[in-house]
Amino acid sequence: MAVVKCKPTSPGRRHVVKVVNPELHKGKPFAPLVEKNSKSGGRNNNGRITTRHIGGGHKQAYRIVDFKRNKDGIPATVERLEYDPNRSANIALVLYKDGERRYILAPKGLKAGDQIQSGVDAAIKAGNTLPMRNIPVGSTVHNVEMKPGKGGQLARSAGTYVQIVARDGAYVTLRLRSGEMRKVEADCRATLGEVGNAEHMLRVLGKAGAARWRGIRPTVRGTAMNPVDHPHGGGEGRNFGKHPVTPWGVQTKGKKTRSNKRTDKFIVRRRSK
């Protein structure tokens, strides 16, 4: 995998930095594991904008990724690595010994021809999935479940991982990349290793059009708006003379937004960011 800085042959190419991976499959995805992915434009079922700055972009097909990794005791061979437009990580097409194919998140170091397995008897190596009570303390894992059988929810983006720092009875303590320390049931599954494609963070789109291809619309500053559109709007010059707020008047610098008191008891230490 190489990080390539483009030559400034035009203003749109001058700042582009690409991540090139020659190991990725260049053909179409595996059709039985692909389904339609309609765009919402950031609107809900009432047609109202619920997420700003979303719209347009290239048509994308959704790849059905196996986050549960619940096919126990059956070894699988990695057929190929693929690009997935729906996530920052790459995915791997694996063929199980019984003939079934599935997509999984591609961990760091995984390549075509490698063997992987799920279940309590799986070996301790990158790409294998086990309950966390069977994974040694100190290991780095990804695609971590928060409820047994629900499927991985933590550490699924490119280059991310979670570290198992302690095991105490029915729970294990995890250290997340944000610095948060959290308890999760020991029967929850996790995949060993860290997610691949860590160089994703080094890419630079280089121009506004590249963001539009990805369905990202412009973000207008509140201070550039009129008073009717934003609390920061209006006035002479650039100073808005108040604490920064969202378009709806909610504090936007440092205000805590967590409101799920039911699961507060599982958070040992809040995130440090």
Curated annotation (Swiss-Prot):
Span list, region Disordered: 28-53, 221-273
Keyword RNA-binding: yes
Pfam families to which the protein is assigned, alphabetical: Ribosomal_L2, Ribosomal_L2_C
Domain of life per record: Bacteria
Gene Ontology cellular component annotations, sorted alphabetically: cytosol; large ribosomal subunit
Molecular-function GO term, any one: structural constituent of ribosome
Low complexity biased stretches: 39-48
NCBIfam families: rplB_bact
Oligomeric form and interacting partners: Part of the 50S ribosomal subunit. Forms a bridge to the 30S subunit in the 70S ribosome.
Protein name: Large ribosomal subunit protein uL2
Species of provenance: Enterobacter sp. (strain 638)
